[in-house]
Amino acid sequence: HVRVNADNPEDAALALEFGAEAIGLCRTEHMFLGDRKNIIQSFILSDDEAVKQQALADLLKVQTEDFLAMFKTMSGRDVVVRLLDPPLHEFLDDPRELEVAITKKEAAGASEEELAALRPRLRRIDSMVESNPMLGLRGVRLSVVFSDLPLMQVRAVATAAARLIKEGVDPRPEIMVPLVSITAEHVQTREVIERVI
């Protein structure tokens, strides 16, 4: 059996053309890059609950659209959806680059109002820096700390699948929880998933 890595419907369609039978890994973190990076940053960095909830709503919308397209392309075939896996810093601005940008703005005479938006952001990102991010806040641990993220992702998977079933499509999603090390991580994430499904 040939399963492929595919993170968008175009890759899934190409895989089918080459004879793939299923998607063995859909890396959802790739769906949060580009212009969507700002949305997940708003969720992670904000202390304002309303901003966090709006970011989650925006993420739910784009994730649902992504999964609708993926599952439709792969109708009748398995799609293994991995919940967010990479270290937290991959979703954030590089703190040293942000520090340089602030210094340049200060030197150029930027207004205090403009700088006031950047300084707290830098402090927040600096507070999240890890000495070894590959072993730190990533995979299931990211899901434990930010439990709304896997909840949103599972809701997007379930919503897309339910909608397509009503349209006569045969979605077959499977959910992978990354980097589980201890039973408690599995139990907590499973409880989150079961609240949706």
Where is each model-derived feature located?
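Conserved alpha/beta-domain cores
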Residues: H1-I197
